[in-house]
């Protein structure tokens, strides 16, 4: 089950879900919503984090070192519950890492950290990917 977290400054309030570390709301101090709020008829999502691949893979997968892997559309981060590893009033850090489930689609050892920070009326987003293995790791973020 996902949780909803809030960070804020004097000028901005941001809500982020632990499911996919997805930003769900960005409001100014008057309560004006800046983010699309989703509509199942068109597109129910808001602000997806796409990792380790952006878009659809040709034939739904790829071959690496002679083995074929099938990858979900836009990768698996959007469907993963992230851990919160740090939270302050204006900043939150989400984290996910490889697991037996992710390795069925992406055969690499990794850590993936997303930092959201509200500074005055701006939202800063920082992505950090750590390759924990010995081989070159290919990935994309969107």
Feature roles, as predicted:
Residues 1-142:
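Surface-exposed acidic/polar loop and edge beta-strand patches at domain peripheries
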């Amino acid at each position: 089950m996902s949780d909803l977290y809030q960070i804020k400054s004097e000028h901005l309030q941001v809500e982020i879900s632990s499911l996919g570390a997805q930003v769900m709301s960005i409001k100014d101090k008057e309560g004006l919503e800046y983010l699309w709020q989703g509509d199942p008829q068109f597109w129910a999502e808001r602000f997806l984090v796409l990792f380790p691949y952006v878009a659809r893979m040709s034939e739904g997968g790829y071959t690496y070192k002679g083995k074929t892997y099938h990858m979900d559309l836009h990768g698996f981060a959007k469907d993963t519950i992230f851990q919160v590893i740090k939270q302050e009033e204006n900043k939150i850090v989400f984290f996910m890492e490889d697991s037996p489930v992710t390795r069925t689609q992406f055969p690499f050892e990794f850590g993936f950290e997303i930092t959201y920070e509200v500074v005055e009326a701006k939202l800063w987003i920082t992505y950090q990917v750590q390759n924990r293995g010995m081989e070159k790791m290919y990935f994309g973020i969107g």
